[in-house]
Amino acid sequence: MSVMVVRKKVTRKWEKLPGRNTFCCDGRVMMARQKGIFYLTLFLILGTCTLFFAFECRYLAVQLSPAIPVFAAMLFLFSMATLLRTSFSDPGVIPRALPDEAAFIEMEIEATNGAVPQGQRPPPRIKNFQINNQIVKLKYCYTCKIFRPPRASHCSICDNCVERFDHHCPWVGNCVGKRNYRYFYLFILSLSLLTIYVFAFNIVYVALKSLKIGFLETLKETPGTVLEVLICFFTLWSVVGLTGFHTFLVALNQTTNEDIKGSWTGKNRVQNPYSHGNIVKNCCEVLCGPLPPSVLDRRGILPLEESGSRPPSTQETSSSLLPQSPASTEHMNSNEMAEDTSIPEEMPPPEPPEPPQEASEAEK
């Protein structure tokens, strides 16, 4: 018995999503289009750690302790895992309104604001929302055709509205929002510890070697160590400073976007409605709270009307389950297969019987 299975091309939702994101692995990986600085981040981390494991760790494990490369490997793996999780995950993109939803929202806005006289500027599209006895304004996004949720903002680089938008980070090649902020914070924290660790033990390595062969001779024999020290020295200040800044924001339950705009620290001195007034509670909510699922449904299947593909024919959707012997299967050509699977044509109507012939002349 032979079975013919015809597979149809499936259109996933990530193939039709608007915005400026790129997708890999059938929609499982989501990043921004500008990935050059992200590759630079990978190169610096991988290159520095490779040199450290190849030269300094081997010497320090013998001279001091074998635990030195073990802790370095743990920090390196944790940093890479959090970096990739931050870069490849959905930061919290909010889907755009469908045409029917956008039309309904426009009708609501027109009914609320009324007719605007010609030549006058229409009023701002804002809704008031109450959080912890405080009024928060929900702004309308003209690109996504939605009223953005609280703390959401539209990223001009990725062209998407992101929930609890913090900032767009080119070093990780993605936006930082509600769904990947904790991984971003853990990445910069672990990277700070890794940078300090590698920098400190490079200094120890140079000091131990200098006691035996001298300082200048050590620098000549280990040019890779000099390169590592320079990279770590210039990286240390920015990474550690960034970690301290975000630790301050986490303690206040505040985002970078809110801090830049002065939403809760400006002249009005409006109290942050999202802060619990306790550092421990704020840290637990930001870093340990439940992770919301992605609302994009990137790997969902689009119906044929939306995917733009033609409907399958009868021959494409049907399968042949006719029992055949091996010999007949080998000698059957494509025309015979088509005849077997095609729909039989209607039989023509029977012809009327011919009238009886006239009697011969002899009978007459």
From Swiss-Prot:
What gene is this protein a product of?
Zdhhc9
Q: Which reaction does it catalyse?
A: L-cysteinyl-[protein] + hexadecanoyl-CoA = S-hexadecanoyl-L-cysteinyl-[protein] + CoA
Map out region (Disordered) in residue numbers: 303-364
Protein name, entry field: Palmitoyltransferase ZDHHC9
- By its UniProt entry, which PANTHER family does this protein fall under? PALMITOYLTRANSFERASE ZDHHC9, ZINC FINGER DHHC DOMAIN CONTAINING PROTEIN
The taxonomy runs: Eukaryota, Metazoa, Chordata, Craniata, Vertebrata
What range(s) does the DHHC domain occupy? 139-189
Where can this protein be found? Endoplasmic reticulum membrane; Golgi apparatus membrane
Q: Hey, which stretches end up on the Lumenal side?
A: 57-63, 205-228
> Cell wall biogenesis/degradation as a keyword?
no
Disulfide pairs here are none
Which residue windows are coiled coil?
none
Q: Which domain of life is it from?
A: Eukaryota
